A protein has these predicted regions:
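Short, polar/flexible loop-turn hinges at active-site or ligand-entry regions and domain interfaces
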Residues: 105-120, 388-389, 543, 564-576
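Structured ligand/cofactor/substrate-binding pocket environments in proteins
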Residues: 60-72, 79, 88-89, 157-160, ...
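N-terminal, positively charged nucleic-acid-binding surface of large information/translation enzymes
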Residues: 2-241, 265, 282-295, 299-314, ...
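Short Cys/His-rich metal-coordination motifs, predominantly Zn2+-binding knuckles/fingers
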Residues: 187, 258, 355, 426-428, ...
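Secondary-structure transition/capping motifs at alpha-helix termini
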Residues: 73-81, 102-115, 135, 139-144, ...
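Short acidic-hydrophobic surface loop/beta-edge motif
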Residues: 206-213, 251-256, 350-354, 423, ...
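Feature 926 captures the class I aminoacyl-tRNA synthetase adenylation module centered on the KMSKS loop
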Residues: 207, 400-460, 464, 508-551, ...
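Active-site-adjacent bridging/hinge elements
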Residues: 40-48, 70, 103, 107-109, ...
Length: 885
């Protein structure tokens, strides 16, 4: 085999696109159900959370997809028929907003264009921009089966949506009714809770007196943040246990600014300790009030049009914008002497994440899914162990949502999306739900039917994603083999909006939980811990990182130190450290391959291996076992850290340095063993690193093996009992400890590596001395020793020799010939003076209350870090001075 020499420097941009195309051309990402069955393979399936076709790759996508890719590559190498099912989401409102904006710039109005032409424009937009994020995922190295790419509005997914809607309607689980929903007055559609952003805003509590009917001069005082909704009040509620108001329960109140009277009702929803203990109930404009209203059969009076202007015929406020009406009503209350006081108050306000308009809760006729029965199997799944969360604590979040679940509003007043398959008879008004337009009304026989104008919530089709992408409702071979899927990787922010809905949909439609594990990750925040956002201008483009440092460096940065479920901070320094690690791997591989070119690598017997060879082989063997366990437990960050530590420290810093004399000596009888060990350990290390850093490992592996090989379809390293060398591990770890101690002493004494020194090792442990006897070469090459003396006592060792203790031995190094003691003491004393001044300065700053209260947090942390650093340096200087004196 002729090896291709690696380039001198690792250049990710020169190899990544080429390698990705190679993987695609060879269909390495493709999973085949028939092949899997034929070859007796176990399936492994992950469904990609479908990114919006409006989206661009952000750090959240990068983290989410890197985690999925790691698991898929790992299982593929283990011999599973691994399917990572990709696709995109039609993102109803997000896409509609984009297309409306594009048309507006062209001078075209959505409604003037008409529904059919507008949908054509949406499909054109999808064709032009919809694959952008997929191409960006390619750059990340995602090994999804792109031949199977799906779209939530493709024919298969659309057929699944129709099937489910009709089934649920026929079972009575889907109904049309009036309930409270989130309404966007600008987009003029209902929106999901996921599309509502809650932010704290400064506002007011307006305290208003409601007169008690028939009792002149007696009032009930309420406090509200939204006085304009007063027009829709249908009751005032008090807590039944509140002694202050027991005598007025059941009495009528005169509703200010109207000619209506409303009752005082008792409901435990009211918190006696909050505000006045009296709550105005507006069932049509508040979710909690809606529930109270339903319990007490209160009227639901909607007082707003779809554009959030007041709808109150005959009133002076009719047609006013809600905020204009607020001002006018407050002024009128003041004039009538009913405004008691206005108190500043901060409260959460819901805004639409698309247009930033304040969302209006409204009771409207919409389509809903009845959730009580459908939630039961989803609750049981977690409790009986069919479904688990990593971390486990997120199972509580899941249960909390399910046990308090409300009926799901699934209709949207949009054009882009799955149109609701309900047809209205224009003669008798009968509603028919069917997969296609009925020829005639089943009730009256009229042939004039009209389809519902609304479309379905995007999450409706997303809820079917794990099985609709595999061909359901058809009984396909893919569905039979790959379903249920194995793991879902997603963020904690969509447990309710997506995870729960997939679980209950899976049970309802297939009788199975759609996945057995949900691996939760947190958010990627900026270096200050802030959420990345356009408004803060702190977003970091993953593609910018990839272009500058390579995909592997970004992937490593996102996974290192990233624990499941926790948010992580993004630091450019970590990206640079990841790039440096890639360079370390590249340079070590290049060194090994250059030596392999000079002498061919032959298979050797384990008996031919030296102590150092057996040590590193045993270490990589244990590493394979540990990393396998970590990946099986979804401890991705821990596994990567172990691979990093092994390659950088054990393999590069120790083993390669240990074997260099053998490689450079053609007469050394153990050279063949060294080369075989280097190649074997390198290949195993690359395989363990591959799921995390696929590009660099592929490039090195192909050059190490042959051009046609691919590491991604090679076998995952397995633990081998014959590679377990406990004695050699103990011996080399002991040598490392001794060499490390010698290096530390030399550094503390400021002795250059070029200056060789005698080393005395004193120990009563003969076994230890025997280990050192066979390792004198390491003391010379790694510990810069001119000579090594092994003895059981201190005889012949100079009194001024510097000593250091390691387990069961003492090491002495006479430095008198190498170091001018007087000059070294003088240097250290000057350093002590400098550090004393620096410590005084930093301590003074940190004890200054003015500085601490006004300085930026980053500056304070910087000074704290200096204090810690200078304190450690001072301790070291004092210890060295004590040694020398």
């Amino acid at each position: 085999m002729i090896m291709k020499e690696l380039e001198k420097n690792y250049n990710p941009s020169a190899i990544e696109e080429k390698l990705y195309q190679k993987w695609m051309d060879n269909k390495y990402f493709h999973a085949d159900a028939e092949r899997g069955k034929r070859e007796g393979k176990k399936p492994f399936t992950i469904v990609m959370p479908p990114p919006n076709i409006t989206g661009q790759l952000h750090m959240g996508h990068a983290l989410d997809n890197t985690m999925q890719d790691i698991l898929t590559r790992y299982k593929r190498m283990q011999g599973y028929e691994a399917l990572w099912q990709p696709g995109t989401d039609h993102a109803a409102i997000a896409t509609e907003v984009k297309v409306i904006d594009k048309l507006r710039k062209e001078g075209v109005d959505k409604h003037d264009l008409g529904r059919d032409k507008f949908l054509e424009a949406c499909w054109d937009w999808k064709k032009e921009y919809g694959t952008r994020i997929i191409k960006q995922l390619h750059k990340l190295g995602s090994s999804a089966d792109w031949d199977r790419e799906r779209f939530t509005m493709d024919k298969g997914c659309s057929d699944a949506v129709l099937e489910v809607f009709v089934k649920l309607y026929e079972k009575g689980y889907i109904y049309k009714g009036s309930r409270i929903i989130n309404w966007c007055p600008v987009c003029q559609t209902s929106i999901s809770d996921a599309e509502v952003e809650h932010e704290e805003q400064d506002g007011f509590f307006w305290h208003i007196n409601y007169p008690i009917v028939g009792e002149d001069g007696r009032f009930v005082e309420i406090a509200t943040t939204r006085p304009e909704t007063l027009l829709g009040d249908t009751a005032v509620a008090v807590n039944p246990e509140d002694e202050r108001y027991k005598d007025i329960i059941g009495k009528m109140l005169k509703l200010p600014l109207t000619d209506r009277e409303i009752p005082v009702i008792a409901d435990e929803y009211v918190d006696k300790e909050f505000g006045t203990g009296c709550v105005k109930i507006t069932p049509a404009h508040d979710p909690n009030d809606f529930e109270v209203g339903r319990r007490h059969n209160l009227p639901e009076i909607c007082i707003m049009h779809d554009d959030a202007t007041i709808d109150c015929k005959g009133s002076k406020y009719d047609g006013m914008d809600r905020y204009e009406a607020r001002k006018a009503m407050v002024e009128d209350l003041k004039k009538q002497g009913l405004l008691v006081k206005v108190v500043p108050h901060s409260h959460n306000v819901g805004t639409h994440d698309r247009c930033k308009t304040t969302v209006e809760p409204m009771v409207k006729q919409q389509w809903f899914v009845r959730m009580e029965e459908m939630a039961k199997p989803a609750i049981a799944a977690l409790k009986n162990g069919d479904l688990k969360f990593v971390p486990e604590s997120f199972g509580k979040t899941y249960l909390h949502w399910l046990e308090g679940i409300r009926d799901w509003c699934i209709s949207r007043q949009l054009w882009w999306g799955h149109r609701i398959p309900a047809y209205y008879c224009q003669e008798c008004g009968e509603i028919t739900v069917a997969k296609s337009m009925p020829e005639k009304c089943p009730k009256c026989g009229c042939t004039h039917l009209k389809q519902d104008e609304d479309t379905l919530d995007t999450w409706f089709s997303s809820a079917l994603w794990p099985f609709s992408t595999l061909g359901w409702p058809e009984k396909t071979k893919e569905l039979e083999y790959f379903y249920p899927t194995d793991v879902l990787v997603t963020g904690y922010d969509i447990i309710f909006f997506w995870v729960i809905r997939m679980v209950f949909s899976g049970y309802e439609q297939t009788g199975k939980c759609p996945f057995n594990t949900v691996l939760i990750h947190g958010l990627v925040r900026d270096s200050q811990g802030r959420k990345m956002s356009k408004s803060l201008g702190n977003g970091i483009d993953p593609l910018e990182v990839i272009d500058k440092y390579g995909a592997d460096a970004l992937r490593m940065t996102l996974i290192t130190g990233n624990a499941p479920g926790n948010d992580m901070r993004f630091y450019w320094e970590r990206v640079e450290a990841s790039r440096n690690f890639a360079n370390k791997v590249w340079n070590a591989s290049r060194f090994i391959m250059m030596n392999m070119e000079k002498a061919p690598v032959h298979e050797v017997s384990l008996d031919d291996l030296t102590m150092a060879d057996k040590w590193i082989l045993s270490k990589v063997n244990t590493l394979a076992k540990d990393v396998t366990e970590n990946l099986d437990k979804f401890e991705l960050g821990i596994g990567l850290q172990k691979v990093y530590d092994f390659i950088w420290e054990e393999f590069c810093d120790w083993y390669i340095e240990m074997v260099k004399p053998r490689l450079w000596n053609d007469e050394d009888s153990t050279k063949a063993a060294a080369l075989w060990t280097l190649k074997t350990v390198l290949i195993n290390s690359l395989k363990l690193l591959h799921p995390y850093m696929p590009f660099i490992t592929e490039e090195i592996f192909c050059n190490l093996q042959d051009e046609e090989a691919s590491i991604m379809v090679s076998a995952w390293p397995e633990y081998k009992a014959e590679w377990n060398f406990e004695q050699e591990e103990y011996a080399v770890e002991t040598i490392k400890e001794a060499v490390r101690a010698i290096r530390n002493v030399r550094t503390s004494m400021n002795v250059a590596p070029s200056k060789k020194a005698k080393v005395y090792v004193v120990s009563e442990n003969q076994k230890l001395l025997q280990i050192f006897e066979h390792s004198k070469v390491f003391f010379a090459t790694l510990g810069y020793a001119s000579e090594v003396f092994l003895q059981s006592d201190k005889q012949g060792i100079a009194d001024d020799a510097v000593s250091v203790v390691i387990p069961e031995a003492s090491i002495y190094i006479p430095f008198a010939e190498l170091v001018d003691i007087a000059k070294e003491i003088e240097r250290l004393q000057k350093e002590e003076e400098r550090l004393t001044k620096e410590l005084a300065r930093v301590t003074g700053m940190l004890s200054n209350e003015k500085f601490v209260s006004k300085a930026p947090e980053a500056k304070i942390n910087e000074e704290k870090a200096k204090l810690e650093k200078y304190t450690q340096m001072m301790e070291q200087v004092k210890a060295r001075l004590a040694q020398l004196k």
